[in-house]
Regions:
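Catalytic cores of NTP-dependent nucleotidyl/adenyl transfer enzymes across multiple folds
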Residues: 124-166
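Helical scaffold of the NTase/Pol beta-like nucleotidyltransferase catalytic core
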Residues: 1-52
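Conserved catalytic core of two-metal-ion nucleotidyltransferases
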Residues: 92-125
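Short histidine-centered catalytic/ligand-binding loop motif
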Residues: 17-27, 71-73, 133-137
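Short amphipathic alpha-helices in soluble, non-transmembrane regions
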Residues: 82-90
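Short glycine-aromatic motifs
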Residues: 46, 91-92
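Active-site nucleotide-donor binding segment shared across nucleotidyl transfer reactions
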Residues: 39-78
């Protein structure tokens, strides 16, 4: 019998979900767009400030983990728990929460990664440092190339230790 994800140790999870990098895939943009539309189908429009494709899959020139990162910004007056509950009801798993930030994932199964995997970063409006990082890499190809080299150099060394890799 396969253990449920929530019953696995961190080490077991790292074995099941190793770090894996791929050359940029054009389909990642499509995955983001399809998931964005799906999110818009169940989240109240007035509770969305912005949805953004972030992370390495949003930078077309670099290798990345085949996991699409999405940032969802909500108005500061919104009860984050309401959005959390809607995400949980629609297939997302809450991974962590702290001081006005929640992280979710989708596509992690007891037998490994699903075909499409997403990390969703729920934030209050204006808490979006990842957008600056994404934009900087997109606007500075030499820096993006250095970042890619760093990622590739750490990949195999920390393949089964996500904390050390990041």
């Amino acid at each position: 019998m396969t253990k449920a994800l929530e019953d696995m140790t961190l080490e077991e999870l790292w074995q099941l979900f190793p770090i894996f990098l791929r050359e940029h895939q054009d389909e990642w943009k499509d995955w983001y767009e399809e998931e964005r539309l799906r999110l818009l189908s169940f989240l109240p429009e007035h509770q969305i400030v912005r949805l953004s494709h972030i992370g390495s899959t949003s930078v077309e020139t670099i290798w990345a983990k085949p996991i699409v990162d999405i940032m969802l910004e909500i108005p500061k007056e919104t009860d984050m728990a309401v959005t959390r509950d809607l995400l949980l009801q629609n297939g997302y798993l809450l991974m962590s929460e702290s001081q006005g930030r929640m992280s979710f994932n989708k596509g992690y199964t007891p037998s490994g990664f699903a075909k499409r995997v997403f990390h969703l970063h729920l934030r209050y409006e204006g808490d979006h440092d990842e957008l600056y990082f994404r934009d900087y890499l997109q606007e500075h190809p030499a820096v993006a190339e250095d970042y890619e080299k760093l990622k590739l150099s750490l990949w195999k060394q920390y393949e089964h230790n996500r904390d050390a890799y990041t």
